Amino acid sequence: MAHSQLLSSEERLFCYRWFHSLLAKELSEPQLQALQAGQFASFFALLAELGFQPQVTDLQNELAKLTAYDSPRLELAADFAQCFLLEGKLSALPYASYYLDERDLSENLAVMDQWLTKFQLKINRLHNEPSDHLCIYLEVLIKLIETEQPVQVQQQFIRQQLLGWLPQWAEKTAQIHSSTAFYQIISNLLLGFLQQDIA
């Protein structure tokens, strides 16, 4: 059953904002401390209720393992770079253009441009990211929910704009060898959450 039938708009917004905050850039010290201090326990419980208990358990285990490092945040920052910032053979670049062929990418970005214009979202403002970066897609999806666009429109966006390439990205992320499995788990969880959101 789609999340739109199980969760309130506020809950779905929280979920997608959470994913965006973890994948937009390296975690800050306050973000990591909040995760390790159990401030997201109720959110993790919600994810478990939705069928993601294995991923939640894995994530909690990874957070516990981080305490063994002298500088957990720097360890995660290195993993973020390893997973997402190196060249294509070494990282799982979070860009649609890396996974779609020219025709599909052109169609995908044409739709993205329409939504970016409609919502007046600015690109290259803070992180110098092109419009095919995963977090730009999440920003548009968040706007679709915030502005109460019809559920069918939201699901079409997920299906056509994201799920045409995100499974390949998540699979590539899973193959990256990093110190922790934090980002591999987050990527898998995001994919599963999106797939369930249109079920």
From Swiss-Prot:
Gene3D superfamilies the UniProt entry points to: 1.20.120.1820, HscB, C-terminal domain
Its main subcellular localisation, reduced to a broad class, is cytoplasm
Q: Does the keyword Cytoplasm apply?
A: yes
**Any one of the GO BP annotations:** protein complex oligomerization
Q: Where in the cell is it found?
A: Cytoplasm
InterPro entries assigned to the protein according to its UniProt record, in alphabetical order: Chaperone_TorD, DMSO/NO3_reduct_chaperone, HscB_C_sf, TorD-like_sf, TorD/DmsD_chaperones
Q: Which Pfam families match?
A: Nitrate_red_del (PF02613)
**Protein keywords:** Chaperone, Cytoplasm
- SUPFAM superfamilies in alphabetical order: TorD-like
GO CC list = cytoplasm
Reported function? Involved in the biogenesis of TorA. Acts on TorA before the insertion of the molybdenum cofactor and, as a result, probably favors a conformation of the apoenzyme that is competent for acquiring the cofactor.
What the record says about family reads: Belongs to the TorD/DmsD family. TorD subfamily.
Task: Please identify the protein, giving its name as recorded.
Answer: Chaperone protein TorD
**Origin species:** Actinobacillus pleuropneumoniae serotype 7 (strain AP76)
**What is the gene called?**
torD
